[in-house]
Amino acid sequence: MGISRDSRHKRSATGAKRAQFRKKRKFELGRQPANTKIGPKRIHSVRTRGGNQKFRALRVETGNFSWGSEGVSRKTRIAGVVYHPSNNELVRTNTLTKSAVVQIDATPFRQWYENHYGATLGKKKGGAHAAHAAEVADAKRSRKVERKLAARSGAAAIESAVDSQFGSGRLYAVISSRPGQSGRCDGYILEGEELAFYLRRLTAKK
């Protein structure tokens, strides 16, 4: 018995069983879920209707995530699933699907910010961070670069909820692609009201 997307096997609105008047059709087929996990990249191609292809990501460990307010995207490592709007089981098993809230490595975005604005993120108290901040501030730059950084300094401020995440080296992000269909696990960093909403959900879950 294959997975079928037809409705002929369902009972009618009054509860009566429907008579089977035809067999299952190829165009009504369904497939098993990909249940994409975090691990070394493993992608299978699936032949679909019309000779087209889908790419079934069985395991991925990186994705292309965008930082909307800064207009920048970077490829980064996915650390784990922390929240899922539809199913807690997907959080427990670290399953990557569209709309899953994940934690990603903040390093590529922190490096971009330090290069672009000449300032550090994630104010941690401690000698190592203070030394790194001083290193970034005192780095040798040409006068042209100094002028560029001075012009950008007005836009350097980011919201505190995102800044504090840089201190831990992990950022909350949402997956917006469909790993089981496209074979990619891309998304965007959570900010503003959306971040506040998911932070409330995460604290309520605990």
Swiss-Prot record:
UniProt keywords, alphabetically: Cytoplasm, Ribonucleoprotein, Ribosomal protein
InterPro entries cross-referenced by the UniProt entry: Ribosomal_eS8, Ribosomal_eS8_CS, Ribosomal_protein_eS8_euk, Ribosomal_Se8/biogenesis_NSA2
One GO-annotated biological process of the protein: maturation of SSU-rRNA from tricistronic rRNA transcript (SSU-rRNA, 5.8S rRNA, LSU-rRNA)
Keyword Ribosomal protein recorded: yes
GO cellular component, one term: cell surface
Region (Disordered): 1-37
A Pfam family assignment: Ribosomal_S8e
TM ranges: none
Source species, domain of life: Eukaryota
Subcellular location: Cytoplasm
GO MF annotations in UniProt: structural constituent of ribosome
Similarity-based family: Belongs to the eukaryotic ribosomal protein eS8 family.
NCBIfam families reported in the protein's UniProt record: eS8 (TIGR00307)
Subunit relationships: Component of the small ribosomal subunit. Mature ribosomes consist of a small (40S) and a large (60S) subunit. The 40S subunit contains about 32 different proteins and 1 molecule of RNA (18S). The 60S subunit contains 45 different proteins and 3 molecules of RNA (25S, 5.8S and 5S).
Function recorded in the entry: Component of the ribosome, a large ribonucleoprotein complex responsible for the synthesis of proteins in the cell. The small ribosomal subunit (SSU) binds messenger RNAs (mRNAs) and translates the encoded message by selecting cognate aminoacyl-transfer RNA (tRNA) molecules. The large subunit (LSU) contains the ribosomal catalytic site termed the peptidyl transferase center (PTC), which catalyzes the formation of peptide bonds, thereby polymerizing the amino acids delivered by tRNAs into a polypeptide chain.
Name of the protein in its database record: Small ribosomal subunit protein eS8
Source lineage: Eukaryota, Fungi, Dikarya, Ascomycota, Saccharomycotina
